[in-house]
Amino acid sequence: MEITSSLKKAFVEQIKIIYWQNKLTSTTLNIDKGKSVLEIEVIEIKLNSKNLDKMVLSKIDKCIPYHILFLLEYEGMYQAFISYKEIENEKIKVNKYYHTQWLEKENLPCKIEGLNMDSVYENFIRQIAGAELNVGSEEKKNLKEDIEQAEEKKQLEKQISALQAKIRKTKQFNRKVELNNELKKLKKMLEKF
């Protein structure tokens, strides 16, 4: 595990203390084991300020071969962080992080729901991500598909913003018409979400 000087600095300046608060397993929760989620670690990090470099969470996530729910605390307010983490053949792939706003601890959306460890983890992600993952139809899809769809939507929104900026800068009428047609196509694609 390589720790860069900037990561070391972030640990020292931004973190007051780290608690390994809980270990959620099928035995401790009295539910079935999951296919990919064996246990969920709950780690509380007390911060020196409201900001924490995401590199710190990513490094911790990559060092611990289990799924992790981070609870960040600053001056009595809490923020839940969780990533979509895939562990295959002892290789850890940490994807995008989702987080709540700063809330009082009892208001954090972290209810244990599910009949097995996979669904408990998936529900944590859905609760914490909130509207960010609630894209598309009401049809229940798997979490990976929802995350991919949310990323596609985000990319499409970026393309639309860039195209709108390009249209504003373009002087030629013919080129503006072309770009507007392209913009309409992208907006139609976005409506599908």
Regions found by a protein language model. Give the residues of each.
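N-terminal, leucine/charged-rich tether regions that mediate assembly and partner docking
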Residues: 1-75
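Peripheral peptide segments
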Residues: 43-48, 90-96, 144
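Alpha-helix boundary/N-cap detector
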Residues: 51, 112-115, 119, 144-147, ...
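General N-terminal targeting signals
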Residues: 48, 85-89, 180, 184
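Extended assembly-interface/linker segments at domain junctions
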Residues: 54-139
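Alpha-helical oligomerization segments
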Residues: 137-141, 146-193
